[in-house]
Amino acid sequence: KKRGYVFISVPSGYEVSSTGVLPDFHKKIKRDELEVVQVDFNLNPVSGQDQHIMYVLGDLHLAGRNDDLKQFDMFAEDLNEQIKDNQSRRQYIMTLGDMTWEIYWNSYNFSSYLKTMNYSFENIQVFHTIGNHDHDVDAEGDFNTVLEYFDYVGPNYYSFNIGKVHYVILDDILCKNTGAGTSESRKYADEVDEEQLEWLKADLGYVDPSMTVVVASHAPMY
């Protein structure tokens, strides 16, 4: 509850609804530890997931500078052509982090990013991975650096199933920010914290051994 949301691992053969490009597999809740809440998710049955396509995008670094948005428009046009050419198959998009650039959030933030994505893509769900530049440089510690991400994008770690694939999204950026608000004050290690590892152990315990498991994170795990 301290994170202010609850999420599910969408099962194979189903999809959740979307808010723009964001799949609605999580819902915000109050952070009050004493309040009991009930949260319901609508699952919509779909077919054809075994032959799905996952488009993977990395390090967009959208910041509204150096013609990056114009370049992204050109890229999105090409990707939409691919999506159109494969419209007989279930298709999804996954990002691998650094969708934004935190030192330029004063002019281009998560709200701006989502407007760009919702303008660029229709009728396709985008699953996000958090990167080091998606953490709040003004915040101190690790947990506080992802609160902005929680509010706009969603969980920083989660899982979902599509067809015969179990996807796991991890946040392997452990921030040690001082909160000074400068790029120099942003300290981090490429590391998955204990909370995620405990969750991952439980998550994988529900996965059929015949499933393919795909793990996504921003920093390489080697």
Regions of interest found by a model, annotated:
Residues 1-19:
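A short, solvent-exposed beta-strand micro-motif common in secreted/extracellular proteins
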Residues 2, 196-199, 213-222:
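Short, intrinsically disordered, charge-balanced linker/junction segments flanking boundaries
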Residues 13-23, 28, 104-207:
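Extended active-site neighborhood of metal-dependent phosphoesterases/phosphodiesterases
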Residues 19-26, 30-107:
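N-terminal active-site segment of His-dependent metallophosphoesterases
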Residues 51, 89-90, 123, 209-212:
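A general structural motif
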Residues 51-64, 164-178, 214-216:
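Active-site-proximal beta-strand elements of phosphoester/diester hydrolases
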Residues 56-58, 92-98, 125-132, 214-218:
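Active-site neighborhood of phospho(di)ester-bond hydrolases with catalytic His/Asp-centered motifs
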Residues 61-62, 100, 134-135, 173-175, ...:
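Short, solvent-exposed loop/turn segments at secondary-structure junctions
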